[in-house]
Amino acid sequence: MKRDEFDHVLRAAAHALGQRDFLVIGTAALLGSYPEESLPERATRSREADLAPFDDPDGDKSMLLEGALDLGSQFEKTFTYYADGVDFRSGVAPYGWRNRLVKYRSPASEPGVGWCLEPYDLAATKICVGRAKDFEFVGALLDAGVIGKSNLMARISLMPKDRITPAQIDRAIRWLDGRQPR
């Protein structure tokens, strides 16, 4: 996703739900910390922004967002990118992630504001979940020097052990230890 697309999605989400603040948990969260020009192509090729509306105890707002801006919506058909309304109550991130959120706001996103996962929290979450595309994404960030191995290892150690299994953490660490720098 490009910055102008991210701005548009935040603006559209804010108008669709009548609220301004959204947690950004997917790859688009990087746009809160870095200009797209400084990111590897793999980090900006997604067409979606994963947005979790704040103050959504029952997940109803996430469902409304899904209908208005998700894959297959008129919004996506018109613009080719979209917002995936997510409910982060079941999500997982390293301890302390809420204190490290990166606020993203621009004149083009108004009235929408994105509270983006910090890049190391995002990367740790992705490689502990461990899908092939997540390893590819994190590998691209490491190869481009956007994130560093030692800081990522430290963040992996903060993953909640009651939500991520020891096997998932071990797999992430083995993958990170076995990577050959490019």
Feature-to-residue mapping (PLM):
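Compositionally biased terminal segments of proteins
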Residues: 1-182
